[in-house]
């Protein structure tokens, strides 16, 4: 038996005034059929009442305790864009953002700029004192920053003010160590250099002419050091792969030893080629025991507060599942469908609302659930689980779980 965990990023939502969510209102005949033929429930990726990041959620879903393995988003983001992070490196995730001359943020995502490769070149390879700057864009407005040099620390604050209309935060050390003080100073200097180099860059001058938000600042957050994680194959005995469009998820996969399968046209945006991803899933199953799949678009729509787009993306994902289920055997593959977190339209950010989950495959205890949405799957046989329960359940179904006790 093989297994797929299929994650619709930001899937869950809260009811609008009509009692609907994008998932409830979307036409999803395949998801509904899989719910009817599978075992369903609700799932909190990290824990009840905890608003998870995509990083901590995916770690949990892969069977890792995020409270002991997670050091910050930065190392995963950097790893995902191809940086070979070394011991002692300090890594951050970054947004390209729009700021005014006083560093007041006017657009946290720089108008969702699509291509920042030319801007990347302005910062990658810089040196500030004895610290090397490694800077890589990771798709759209996202990027990864790595500081490499002696005497650095991840005990520093973030620069992200979280909301527009506020100033980019000055970085502060979180302890009295000289390493933390040095690192904070280096990052603060880098932010000033970034503004000077990016504000008048031709890419941004052209965006001004088109009345588009400029990408004239980088905002680092999610600082961390490289964690020590047991490889997925060693932990489960499964040869695993990952199909995802975003650098963060690719980085998590690489960090735990999953092979990352790149699919042309799949970049983690709402415009990703989902059918190309569906074809890749079917093909990859021929050579792997396990695949982690992440489809990002619904999360982007949730962050933008775009109800109709989120519903449309969910319907497009259902078309993916139509192709996949027609080209795999229920007797050979266990297929898990869920999300990593909710991104409600009203919040435009992650929430702790639980997610619907279904496991479809041979010999599951089919329950009475007939629709896959936030309001129906709680009646299912899985009841209410955490993300860290998924892999043990799958391994038991696949008959590879070890017995606990005599």
From Swiss-Prot:
Keyword Hydrolase: no
Keyword match Isomerase: yes
Pathway given in the UniProt record: Carbohydrate degradation; glycolysis; pyruvate from D-glyceraldehyde 3-phosphate: step 3/5
A GO molecular-function annotation: metal ion binding
EC number: 5.4.2.12
One BP annotation, GO: glycolytic process
Keywords: Glycolysis, Isomerase
Reaction equations catalysed: (2R)-2-phosphoglycerate = (2R)-3-phosphoglycerate
Record InterPro entries: Alkaline_phosphatase_core_sf, ApgAM_prokaryotes, Metalloenzyme, Pglycerate_mutase_ApgM
Class of enzymatic activity (EC top level): isomerase
Pfam families linked: Metalloenzyme, PhosphMutase
Family recorded in the similarity comment: Belongs to the BPG-independent phosphoglycerate mutase family. A-PGAM subfamily.
Function recorded in the entry: Catalyzes the interconversion of 2-phosphoglycerate and 3-phosphoglycerate.
PANTHER family: COFACTOR-INDEPENDENT PHOSPHOGLYCERATE MUTASE (PTHR31209), METALLOENZYME DOMAIN-CONTAINING PROTEIN (PTHR31209:SF0)
Descriptive protein name: 2,3-bisphosphoglycerate-independent phosphoglycerate mutase
Gene: apgM
């Amino acid at each position: 038996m093989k297994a797929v965990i299929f994650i619709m990023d930001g899937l869950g939502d809260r009811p609008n005034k009509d009692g609907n969510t994008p998932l409830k209102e979307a036409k999803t005949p395949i998801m509904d059929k899989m719910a009817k033929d599978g075992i369903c429930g609700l799932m909190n990726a990290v824990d009840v009442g905890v608003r998870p990041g995509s990083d901590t959620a995916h770690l949990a879903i892969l069977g890792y305790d995020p409270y002991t393995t997670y050091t910050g988003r930065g190392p995963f983001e950097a790893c995902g864009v191809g940086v070979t992070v070394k011991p002692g490196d300090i890594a951050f995730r970054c947004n390209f953002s729009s700021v005014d001359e006083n560093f007041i943020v006017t657009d946290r995502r720089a108008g969702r700029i699509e291509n920042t490769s030319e801007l990347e070149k302005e910062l990658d390879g810089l040196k500030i004192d004895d610290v090397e700057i490694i800077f890589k864009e990771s798709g759209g407005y996202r990027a990864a920053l790595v500081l490499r040099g002696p005497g650095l620390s991840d005990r520093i604050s973030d620069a992200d003010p979280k909301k527009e209309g506020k100033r980019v935060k000055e970085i502060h050390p979180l302890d009295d160590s000289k390493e933390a003080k040095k690192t904070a100073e280096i990052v603060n200097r880098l932010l000033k250099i970034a503004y000077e180099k990016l504000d008048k860059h031709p890419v941004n001058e052209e965006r001004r002419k088109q009345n588009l938000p400029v990408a004239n600042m980088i905002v680092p957050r999610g600082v961390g050091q490289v964690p020590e994680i047991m490889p997925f194959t060693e932990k489960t005995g499964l040869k695993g792969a990952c199909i995802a469009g975003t650098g963060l998820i690719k980085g998590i996969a690489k960090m735990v030893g999953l092979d990352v399968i790149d699919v042309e046209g799949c970049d983690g945006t709402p415009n990703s080629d989902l059918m190309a991803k569906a074809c890749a899933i079917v093909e990859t199953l021929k050579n792997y025991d396990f695949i982690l799949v992440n489809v990002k678009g619904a999360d982007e729509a949730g962050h933008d507060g775009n109800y109709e787009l989120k519903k449309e993306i969910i319907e497009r994902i259902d078309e993916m599942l139509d192709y996949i289920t027609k080209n795999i055997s229920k007797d050979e593959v266990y297929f898990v469908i869920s999300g990593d977190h909710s991104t409600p339209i009203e919040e435009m950010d992650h929430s702790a609302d639980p997610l619907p989950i279904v496991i479809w495959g041979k010999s599951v205890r089919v329950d009475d659930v007939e629709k896959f949405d936030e309001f129906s799957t709680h009646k299912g046989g899985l009841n209410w689980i955490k993300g860290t329960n998924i892999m043990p359940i799958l391994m038991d179904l696949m008959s590879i779980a070890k017995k606990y006790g005599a």
